[in-house]
């Protein structure tokens, strides 16, 4: 094991511990605020925000449990797992790695689902619970298929280890569990990788598409069932939540695809891939608190009231009847 890898292992151990602590704390707080805050501004939007928070919890737990980094070889894909999963066997690490990949994409898709719901709510009446259930089932199909193809990909760990030791003899094989895919060019592996790539690269484009459609509806209709300013702020928050993974995850993921084709790998990028994938687990709930006004006010009223330095002005929970028609020029401004 090189000195650089030793330092990186120490860093990621500390990072994943902090990440899972922050992510669980903030997401559980968000779920508590969701449960105790009632506002007609949100309607059934809380189901979709709850869905995102749930996937972020899965992302934080699975990335901490695995602490994995993929290493591209010529014909195989190796995965070094430094997390607690290594104490439960290689098969446990293999399943956890598949869950990590799929949960990151599923969390991103859950934000797109919120975009879709907001668009449908403005376009047509979309409030029946069975319609929500149908939508969740349809959108869960993509991550589920991705997970199945990952689990069905050839995974002869002995073949993976033999090629990895040949190409990367200086890596740490003592303190990590080595798993991976023995044939990275097989149909199942290609399909799984294509689905992940599709989810990573297409999410921002889909988000921009629905943002444009929603803004078009808001600009062409002066009367809305919800305040225009609130809706625009919510949509901007969802867009930022979609773009953050795009900005931080695309560079290392693109290099990972390149390394699979070239057979060359960089130690730093290997670690960065899943570090950036887990980064949003505690960032997204913070953005939800900021951009979803009823939750921000509830947070200030129930939590920040214990901190004298934070003003309580404008923290009351305000709800709006759904039957009232709001004009753009009469949208109330809120102090924060």
Swiss-Prot record:
Gene assigned in the entry: srd-51
State the protein's name.
Answer: Serpentine receptor class delta-51
Q: Which InterPro entries match?
A: 7TM_GPCR_serpentine_rcpt_Srd (IPR019421), Nematode_rcpt-like_delta (IPR050920)
The record gives the membrane topology as: Multi-pass membrane protein
Instruction: Provide the protein's localization.
Output: Membrane
Family, per the entry? Belongs to the nematode receptor-like protein srd family.
Q: Which UniProt keywords apply?
A: Membrane, Transmembrane, Transmembrane helix
- GO CC list: membrane
Q: Cross-referenced Gene3D superfamilies, in alphabetical order?
A: Rhodopsin 7-helix transmembrane proteins
Pfam families given in the database record: 7TM_GPCR_Srd (PF10317)
Organism the protein comes from? Caenorhabditis elegans
Q: Which residue ranges traverse the bilayer?
A: 14-34, 48-68, 93-113, 133-153, 188-208, 237-257, 275-295
